[in-house]
Swiss-Prot record:
InterPro entries: DDX47/Rrp3_DEADc, DEAD/DEAH_box_helicase_dom, DEAD_box_RNA_helicase, Helicase_ATP-bd, Helicase_C-like, P-loop_NTPase, RNA-helicase_DEAD-box_CS, RNA_helicase_DEAD_Q_motif. Required for efficient ribosome biogenesis. May have a role in mRNA splicing. Involved in apoptosis. ATP binds at A68, E69, T70, G71, S72, G73, K74, T75. Its EC number is 3.6.4.13. Keywords: Acetylation, Apoptosis, ATP-binding, Helicase, Hydrolase, mRNA processing, mRNA splicing, Nucleotide-binding, Nucleus, Phosphoprotein, RNA-binding, rRNA processing. Belongs to the DEAD box helicase family. DDX47/RRP3 subfamily. The modification N-acetylalanine is found at A2. This is Probable ATP-dependent RNA helicase DDX47. CDD domains: DEADc_DDX47, SF2_C_DEAD. One of its GO terms (molecular function) is RNA binding. Residues 237-397 form the Helicase C-terminal domain. It comes from Homo sapiens (Human). GO terms for cellular component: membrane; nucleolus; nucleoplasm; nucleus. PANTHER family: ATP-DEPENDENT RNA HELICASE RHLE-RELATED, RNA HELICASE.
C-alpha cells in the first residue's frame, strides 16, 4: 500500500448507534430537497442506521470509515453526500467508486442514476468482461461518477489517451475488505498515487481487517468511524438450521427441501462454478425454475440471471460467493448453503441475503461427513448452536431414482455445453446457460415433483 500520510487514527463516532432512526428523515440529516424527493420516489421512507451516522458527517466534509453489515443501506450513505456536494459544485469526473465485483458496480451505478435522475447525473461503469473501446468512449464524455473495479480502471488510466483523475473530489472504496482479499492491493496503491490528496474519502467494509486498517492509514485523513455492527452476528429474524447429510445424497435432500418449502424464493450457494452450473441443470431437468450466477458466465448472462431472479421470473438462484455480498436482491425467503463455506465469515454474508430490512427468513446449511469441522467453526463464530432442520428421511429416499436420472441428464448437458464453448458458437441471446435443459427435462418423467397428500 502507499506510504501512510501520517493521518490520525479514526475518531470514534462508533458507539452503539442509538435507536432514534424512527424520528429522523433524510432532510433532518442535511440532504437537499431535490435528493429527498428522489429518496421518496425510490421508496426510501426513512434513513437506515448507517445513513443516520454517516451522512451528516460526510456533509461536514469528514472522511468516513463505515463498518456495516450487508443490506444496511451503505450505497445511500455515500451516494447522497456525493450528489449533495455535486449540486453545490458541479464538475465532471467528480467521484470514483471502487468495488470488488462487476455486478456490484452496475448496481451502484443504477442507484446513483436513480437518485440523480432529476439533476442529470451521468455515471460510467468501468469493469472487466466488457469491451474496452466502448468504455473509453464513455470516459471521453467525462461522466460525473465513475464506478469501477480496480484492475480495469488501471488499464484505462495507463492506456486511454486523455483520461485522468487529477481533478477528482471524492473516492469511495466499497466492500474494501473484499477488494483487498481479491489481491487488488497493487492496483489500489497505483490509483491512490494518481488522484489528488486533497479529496474526501469514504471507506466502507463489513469487517475491519489488518489490511483495511493499513489502507485506512494510507488513504484517509482524520477519519470518523461509523459502526453499525462491530462483531459477527446474524439478524434476529433469521431462522438458521443445518441438515447432516451423507455426501452422495446432497442433491436428493436439496430437491426435498425445495418441495417442502415450495412457494418461496431461494438462493442456493455452491462452492464452484461447475457445481453451480450442474445443480442448476439438475433442478431445471426436474421442472424447477432455477438459474445460475457464477464467474464463468459472460457479463450479459450474469446480469440477465440476476434480473430474472429479481423480477421473480425465476424462483431459485444458484450462485457462487460472487452473490453473497453487496448485491441488492430483495425478497429472498430461504438461503441454502448447498456447499458449506470454507471461510466462516462467508457464512454471515451468504445468510445475509435473507431476513433483510426487518423481514424474516430461513437459512439451511448442508453438513456432510467431510464438513463437521467447518460447521463447528461457523457455530463458534456466530456464538450459537444451530438446530437441525426436520426431514422425513423415508420420503427423501423415495426421490433418489428420479434425482439420479436428472443427474445423468445434467451431466450430459454440461458436457454438451462444454463442447459448444470449444466450438465457439455464437452467444444464444440473453438465455442463461441452463436454457438448453428444457428439451432434456421432458425426458425426466413427470416434471416437477409434487408434494404427497397429507403433508
Amino acid at each position: 500500500m502507499a506510504a501512510p500520510e501520517e493521518h490520525d487514527s479514526p475518531t470514534e463516532a462508533s458507539q452503539p448507534i442509538v435507536e432514534e432512526e424512527e424520528t429522523k428523515t433524510f432532510k433532518d440529516l442535511g440532504v437537499t430537497d431535490v435528493l429527498c424527493e428522489a429518496c421518496d420516489q425510490l421508496g426510501w421512507t426513512k434513513p437506515t442506521k448507517i445513513q443516520i451516522e454517516a451522512i451528516p458527517l460526510a456533509l461536514q466534509g469528514r472522511d468516513i470509515i463505515g463498518l456495516a453489515e450487508t443490506g444496511s443501506g451503505k450505497t445511500g450513505a455515500f451516494a447522497l453526500p456525493i450528489l449533495n456536494a455535486l449540486l453545490e459544485t458541479p464538475q465532471r469526473l467528480f467521484a470514483l467508486v471502487l468495488t470488488p465485483t462487476r455486478e456490484l458496480a452496475f448496481q451502484i451505478s443504477e442507484q446513483f442514476e436513480a437518485l440523480g435522475s432529476s439533476i442529470g447525473v451521468q455515471s460510467a461503469v468501468i469493469v472487466g468482461g466488457i469491451d474496452s473501446m466502448s468504455q473509453s468512449l464513455a470516459l471521453a464524455k467525462k461522466p460525473h461518477i465513475i464506478i469501477a473495479t480496480p484492475g480495469r480502471l488501471i488499464d484505462h488510466l495507463e492506456n486511454t489517451k486523455g483520461f485522468n483523475l487529477r481533478a477528482l473530489k471524492y473516492l469511495v472504496m466499497d466492500e474494501a475488505d473484499r477488494i483487498l482479499n481479491m489481491d487488488f492491493e497493487t492496483e489500489v496503491d497505483k490509483i491512490l498515487k494518481v488522484i489528488p490528496r486533497d479529496r474526501k474519502t469514504f471507506l466502507f467494509s463489513a469487517t475491519m481487517t489488518k489490511k483495511v486498517q493499513k489502507l485506512q492509514r494510507a488513504a484517509l485523513k482524520n477519519p470518523v468511524k461509523c459502526a453499525v455492527s462491530s462483531k459477527y452476528q446474524t439478524v434476529e429474524k433469521l431462522q438458521q438450521y443445518y441438515i447432516f447429510i451423507p455426501s452422495k445424497f446432497k442433491d436428493t435432500y436439496l430437491v426435498y427441501i425445495l418441495n417442502e418449502l415450495a412457494g418461496n424464493s431461494f438462493m442456493i450457494f455452491c462452492s464452484t462454478c461447475n457445481n453451480t452450473q450442474r445443480t442448476a441443470l439438475l433442478l431445471r431437468n426436474l421442472g424447477f425454475t432455477a438459474i445460475p450466477l457464477h464467474g464463468q458466465m459472460s457479463q450479459s448472462k450474469r446480469l440477465g440471471s440476476l434480473n430474472k431472479f429479481k423480477a421473480k421470473a425465476r424462483s431459485i438462484l444458484l450462485a457462487t460467493d460472487v452473490a453473497s455480498r453487496g448485491l441488492d436482491i430483495p425478497h429472498v425467503d430461504v438461503v441454502v448453503n448447498f456447499d458449506i463455506p470454507t471461510h466462516s465469515k462467508d457464512y454471515i454474508h451468504r445468510v445475509g441475503r435473507t431476513a433483510r430490512a426487518g423481514r424474516s427468513g430461513k437459512a439451511i446449511t448442508f453438513v456432510t461427513q467431510y464438513d463437521v469441522e467447518l460447521f463447528q467453526r461457523i457455530e463458534h463464530l456466530i456464538g450459537k448452536k444451530l438446530p437441525g432442520f426436520p426431514t422425513q428421511d423415508d420420503e427423501v429416499m423415495m426421490l433418489t431414482e428420479r434425482v439420479a436420472e436428472a443427474q445423468r441428464f445434467a451431466r450430459m448437458e454440461l458436457r454438451e455445453h462444454g463442447e459448444k464453448k470449444k466450438r465457439s458458437r455464437e452467444d444464444a441471446g440473453d438465455n442463461d446457460d441452463t436454457e438448453g435443459a428444457i428439451g432434456v427435462r421432458n425426458k425426466v418423467a413427470g416434471g416437477k415433483m409434487k408434494k404427497r397428500k397429507g403433508r
